[in-house]
């Protein structure tokens, strides 16, 4: 079920991006959204790595 929801979400996002990208003024907005998404992903990865390190340190 989660896979289906993820697929549908990605499909909708790609559909919206294809419609929006036809408008030149939205190009800057799309780049900003992508930049924010990348920052959020890096932050999430850093938190996950720190959590893993803390678990390893606590386990020993």
From Swiss-Prot:
Localization annotation: Secreted
Tissues where this protein is expressed: Expressed by the venom secretory cell of the spine. The spine is a cuticular structure containing a single large nucleated venom-secreting cell at its base. It is an independent unit capable of producing, storing and injecting venom. On the back of D.vulnerans caterpillars, spines are grouped together by 50 to 100 to form scoli, of which there are eight in D.vulnerans.
Domain of life: Eukaryota
GO molecular function: toxin activity
Signal peptide span: 1-24
GO cellular component entries: extracellular region
Any one Gene Ontology BP term: killing of cells of another organism
Keywords: Antibiotic, Antimicrobial, Fungicide, Secreted, Signal, Toxin
Recorded family membership: Belongs to the limacoditoxin-2 (cecropin-like) family.
Protein role: Peptide that induces pain in mammals and has insecticidal, antimicrobial and antiparasitic activities. Induces irreversible paralysis in D.melanogaster when tested at high doses. Shows a moderate antiparasitic activity against the major pathogenic nematode of ruminants (H.contortus, EC(50)=24.5 uM). Has moderate to potent antimicrobial activities against all Gram-positive and -negative bacteria tested, and against the fungus C.neoformans (var. grubii), but has no activity against the fungus C.albicans.
Protein name per the record: DELTA-limacoditoxin(2)-Dv12
Taxonomic classification: Eukaryota, Metazoa, Ecdysozoa, Arthropoda, Hexapoda
């Amino acid at each position: 079920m989660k896979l289906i929801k993820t697929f549908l979400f990605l499909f909708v996002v790609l559909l919206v991006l294809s419609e929006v990208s036809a408008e030149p003024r939205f190009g800057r907005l799309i780049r900003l959204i992508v930049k924010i998404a990348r920052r959020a992903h890096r932050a999430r990865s850093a938190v996950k790595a720190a959590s893993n390190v803390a678990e390893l340190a606590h386990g020993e």
